[in-house]
Amino acid sequence: MKLTNFKRSVFIAMLVVLFGTFSNAVSAQSNKKQKYKVAVCDWMILKRQKLGAFGLASEIKADGIELDMGGLGKRPTFDSKLGDPIERQKFLDKSKETGVGISSIAMSGFYAQSFAKRDSINLMINDCVATMKNMKVKVAYLPLGTESDLTKNPELRPIIIERLKWAGKQVGKIGGVIAIETSLNATEEKKLLEEIGCKHIKSSFNFANAVDNGRDIATELKILGKKYLAQIHASTTDTVWLENDKNVDMPKIKKTLDEMNWKGWLIVERSRDVTQVHNVKANYGANVAYLKKIFQN
């Protein structure tokens, strides 16, 4: 009798494992067919370059994560595990296991560090491009941040253009794209991209930039155009969840992107409810669910 119960338990355990694997495979296959996919920033869900980011993203039903290169500070390059083949493989295995993809490789260190003034920019970009190549990720996210804000520091424009032209050549070698986030409006950002003149440098459009400056998101997207749009940070400065944000007309945004025939990743960075700003699962779960409701229905 005990042996029979043991066999039954083993059989049930095997079924659970097989069902989990099958579910992840079905989920991954379904994600591949979606025109719009929804990701979360690993550093914003407090899992910067941690394997747990995949599990948490899966739990809140995100299709992927934007995987950060790690801290920068005054280091010559990013504090990244991803240059180590053994560590890198762990991330690739976890992505496959959970069915959670990698939307892009982020260089979030440039939020605070100056892309225009740092000496070792070549090493940083090359490390990121190598990571993209080794992880088969086609997009890198580069925020120009406070230190290279072209609205406040227009004198930095020539050096930023020069460096982005060089960076475009490097990422072009692997057929990838560096998606830059600037403080410029869509008209000025398009002019910047035209001046750079490299198909491997595009825009990472941020809802927050438009909303914080009183601009209509859909109009800005139309101006920027499909050609220059690599990915979208589909969230605003922390106040309320996206579904409660009166400044974000999500059905209108989807209609605009449909008309542009654009497809790609919508990435949740913020839009946290300030009354529960530290509740990661509630904030990111709600925003992911709302984006999927609008864009994947």
Residue ranges and their predicted role:
Residues 44, 69-71, 108-111, 144-148, ...:
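Active-site-proximal loop/turn and secondary-structure-junction residues that shape catalytic pockets
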Residues 96-98, 111-203, 211-212:
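Active-site acidic/histidine proton-transfer and metal-coordination neighborhood
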Residues 81-88, 118-126, 153-164, 216-222, ...:
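Charged helix-capping and loop-helix junction motifs
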Residues 66, 104-106, 141, 179, ...:
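Conserved beta-strand positions in the central sheet of alpha/beta enzyme cores
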Residues 1-12:
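Bacterial N-terminal signal peptides that target proteins for export
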Residues 12-21:
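Bacterial N-terminal signal peptides
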Residues 27-39, 46-63, 98, 186-297:
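Histidine-acidic metal/acid-base catalytic patches
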Residues 68-92, 144-151:
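Glycine-rich, proline-tolerant flexible connector loops at the mouths of alpha/beta enzymes
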